[in-house]
Amino acid sequence: MEAEHRSHLRDATRDDEPLLEAMTVEAVYLPDGSDPVSRSLLDDPRLRRYFEGFGTQPDDVGVVATCEGVDVGACWARCFSPDAPGYGWVAADVPELSIAIADPWRGRGLGTLMLRTLLDRLAVRGCRQVSLSVDPASPARRLYERLDFLHLGWEGTSMTMIRQLGTAAR
């Protein structure tokens, strides 16, 4: 994992909202040959809640991967309410995780590094579970399964997965 030696993780802050917005676009799974994601999808309030105002709620937590001085990925979690749920919403006290890496930096172990770090931070904060939403065809699904996320249900065509915290991520 060559990139890990040149990479650095830092805490995500309020100032990272533009990065989290960009990473939200990166996180949208598209099969090979699909048209690029339009940034207009960010007009959807249900998607905007993943990054808008990040760092203003006490349960917001995240890490940013920086390689060669450039922010290349982020992994973050937020809690949502039943009246404004995320796509992988389970309960108001279960944070929902988002993760994305800029395309040129994928496949270098950064996703695993960021995800393990965030899982540890959530456990230290006393969170018992974390959820996420993933397209079943996304390569990220294998990472989640390798780190003990389990299929919980469906939201449209996406899987909701959940992981118990307090257990070591392999």
Give names to the regions the model predicted.
Residues 1-15, 30, 167-170:
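Conserved N-terminal entry element of GNAT/NAT acetyltransferase domains
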Residues 145-155:
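Conserved acetyl-CoA-binding loop of GNAT-fold acetyltransferases
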Residues 107-120, 124, 145-146:
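Conserved acetyl-CoA-binding loop-helix of GNAT-fold acetyltransferases
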Residues 57, 66-98:
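Conserved acyl-donor/pantetheine-binding loop and adjacent beta-alpha core of acyl/acetyltransferases
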Residues 96-107, 134:
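A short, internal acetyl-CoA/4′-phosphopantetheine-binding micro-motif in the GNAT/acyltransferase core
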Residues 111, 115, 137-140, 157-163:
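Short glycine/proline-centered loop/turn elements that form peptide/ligand docking sites
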Residues 122-135:
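Conserved GNAT acetyl-CoA-binding A-motif
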Residues 29-30, 38-62, 67:
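Active-site rim helix/loop that mediates acceptor-substrate recognition in acyltransferases
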